Each structure stands twice: as structure tokens, then as C-alpha cells.
């Protein structure tokens, strides 16, 4: 498999104090990987470390075979995009302008959109199903619509890797299904690699190729949803969920 991200003996945390240690994982091109675990377990810290928002306590993160720290911010922005729970500082921006900001790695902050950029922006709006919202102010949208805008912005960035932090948050059930189908299309048809976090166990089990499980005072566990269920590992990370319920989710 073609590894796009790999960690070696990675320890993550803040102020030199490790929250998780000995993380040795990899992301393969075209995979959908789910990051799961309770609040406070280290999901956000791992996300921030893999995206160079914070530095590792120790160890290494490799991106496309190079140390992550060797890339400039612009170089990183052409390789991975982010869908975070944070929203734009200027809530009065139009949807079109926010999605167009995804093109900045290719045009610079002061440059104008070229025809190709506009085409990609409009295609991204259409892919997520929000073309009709293009001229709306972001502040006027529902929470679910705002989430779709941020996903469209990541698509406009046109990167081989997409990180999504709670992408299904605020989405109603039909929109969740749309998101799932979109993630599958991006993975299978365009070869996008997607790492997403979620508290939605059905989403995690049913639609990911691989899961990374984190929990306080436990080592990170990696495996396919079926492997983690069959081995009883899911029960240790999601104790309120019975084995019968778990099997019903993935069958």
C-alpha cells in the first residue's frame, strides 16, 4: 500500500508532557480511517500533531515520505485540507467567498481566482449540494449548512488527504447519509485519503476501512471495524455498547 502519512514512535501532548506515547500508525492512499474515543482521550491532540498545528513531544510524523516539519505551510496546504469544528472569524462572509478561500495554496492570498479556480469552487459547491447557498451570508445558515460549507471549502483545496474533525456534527440523518456517500466517492473514485473523528458509532463501524481507537491510559489500537469487534477491543473503548448491538451495526 502507498503510505501517505506515517508515525514512528510518536508521543503527543502539550508543554513536553505526553498524553499518548509509542504511536506507530500509517494512512494509506484512498483509505477512510476513523479516529474514535471519548473526550479527553487525545483525539484532538493527535489531529493537531498530524496536521502540524502542534509539535510532537517526541518521535516523527512523515508526510509523503518527508518529515512533516520540513514542509512550509503552503506546501502542507497543497497536500492536506482540514474540516474542523471551528468556523470562520467573519461570519458575514458569503458562502462563495469562504469556499473560494480553499484555493489559496494555489493563488496566494491577494491573487484573483482564475477560470480553473472558479470551476473547482463551483464544482465543490455542487458536490456537497449547496450551490443554491453560494450568495448567502454564512451567519444566516443552519448548523448543518455551515458544516457543508466547510466541507466544500476543503474540497476546493483539492488535496490528496482530508482531515475531518466530527464532520457529521450538526447534520440531520439524510445529510449524514449524503456525507457518507461523498466520503466513499472521494475515496474510491478520486483516491482521497480521509481521516475523520466521530462519536457516531454507526458511522465509525459501518463506513470506515480502518479504525484508530484511543482512550485514557490505553494504547492506540488499530484495525478494521470487524477485527476490533471480533477481538472484543471495541468493548473496552465503548463499554456501554453490547456485542450484539455492535454486530448489528456492521452486518
Q: Each PLM stretch: what is its role?
A:
Residues 59-67:
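Conserved ABC transporter NBD signature motif
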Residues 198-199:
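H-loop/switch region of ABC-family ATPase nucleotide-binding domains
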Residues 51:
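Helix-to-loop junction immediately C-terminal to a conserved catalytic motif
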Residues 137-141:
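Conserved ABC ATPase signature
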Residues 36-38:
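The feature captures the beta-strand-to-loop junction immediately N-terminal to the Walker
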Residues 238-251:
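ABC ATPase nucleotide-binding domains
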Residues 162-165:
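Catalytic Walker B motif of ABC-type/P-loop ATPase nucleotide-binding domains
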Amino acid at each position: 500500500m502507498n503510505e501517505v502519512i506515517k508515525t514512528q514512535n510518536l508521543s503527543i501532548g502539550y508543554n513536553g508532557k505526553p498524553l499518548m506515547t509509542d504511536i506507530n500508525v500509517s494512512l494509506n492512499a484512498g483509505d477512510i480511517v476513523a479516529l474514535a474515543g471519548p473526550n479527553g482521550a487525545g483525539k484532538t491532540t493527535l489531529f493537531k500533531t498530524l496536521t502540524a498545528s502542534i509539535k510532537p513531544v517526541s518521535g516523527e510524523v512523515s508526510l509523503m515520505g518527508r518529515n512533516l516539519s520540513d514542509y512550509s505551510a503552503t506546501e502542507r496546504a497543497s497536500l492536506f485540507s482540514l474540516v474542523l469544528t471551528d468556523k470562520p472569524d467573519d461570519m458575514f462572509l458569503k458562502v462563495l467567498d469562504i469556499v473560494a478561500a480553499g484555493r489559496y495554496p494555489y493563488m496566494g492570498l491577494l491573487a484573483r481566482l482564475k477560470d480553473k479556480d472558479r470551476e473547482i469552487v463551483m464544482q465543490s459547491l455542487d458536490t456537497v449540494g449547496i450551490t443554491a447557498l453560494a450568495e448567502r451570508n454564512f451567519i444566516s445558515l443552519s448548523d448543518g449548512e455551515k458544516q457543508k460549507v466547510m466541507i466544500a471549502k476543503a474540497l476546493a483545496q483539492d488535496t490528496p488527504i482530508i482531515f475531518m474533525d466530527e464532520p457529521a456534527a450538526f447534520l440531520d440523518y439524510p445529510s449524514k447519509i449524503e456525507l457518507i456517500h461523498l466520503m466513499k466517492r472521494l475515496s474510491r473514485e478520486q483516491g482521497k485519503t480521509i481521516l475523520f473523528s466521530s462519536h457516531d458509532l454507526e458511522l465509525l463501524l459501518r463506513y470506515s476501512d480502518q479504525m484508530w481507537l484511543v482512550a485514557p491510559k490505553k494504547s492506540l489500537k488499530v484495525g478494521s471495524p470487524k477485527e476490533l469487534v471480533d477481538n472484543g477491543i471495541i468493548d473496552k473503548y465503548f463499554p456501554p455498547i453490547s456485542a450484539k448491538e455492535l454486530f448489528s451495526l456492521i452486518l
